[in-house]
Amino acid sequence: MSKECYFTGRKTVSSNNRSHAMNQTKRVVKPNLQKVTILENGELKTVWASAKALKKLPAGVERV
């Protein structure tokens, strides 16, 4: 199971730190993922979901 949002597909991306002199170094930007149990089509599933997705769960999906 990868660290990717089950609903939105958000995952870790790479970005740059920028200093005042505009030097750049690589860094990692991670989404706010929570491990949650959901009830989907009568089945219990444990999935990674972003905090934003948990605010607006799709129809037919219930958090347990």
Swiss-Prot record:
Name the residues that span the membrane: none
Q: Does the keyword Transmembrane helix apply?
A: no
**Which stretches are annotated as coiled coil?**
none
Cellular component, GO annotation: ribonucleoprotein complex; ribosome
- Output the InterPro entries linked to this UniProt entry: Bacterial_rp_bL28 (IPR050096), Ribosomal_bL28 (IPR026569), Ribosomal_bL28/bL31-like_sf (IPR034704), Ribosomal_bL28_bact-type (IPR001383), Ribosomal_bL28_sf (IPR037147)
Q: Where is the composition biased (Polar residues)?
A: 11-23
A biological process (GO) annotation for this entry?
A: translation
Instruction: List the GO molecular function terms.
Output: structural constituent of ribosome
Q: Which UniProt keywords apply?
A: Ribonucleoprotein, Ribosomal protein
Q: Where is this region: Disordered?
A: 1-23
Q: PANTHER family per the record?
A: 50S RIBOSOMAL PROTEIN L28 (PTHR39080), LARGE RIBOSOMAL SUBUNIT PROTEIN BL28A (PTHR39080:SF1)
Into which family does the record put it?
Answer: Belongs to the bacterial ribosomal protein bL28 family.
Q: What is this protein called?
A: Large ribosomal subunit protein bL28
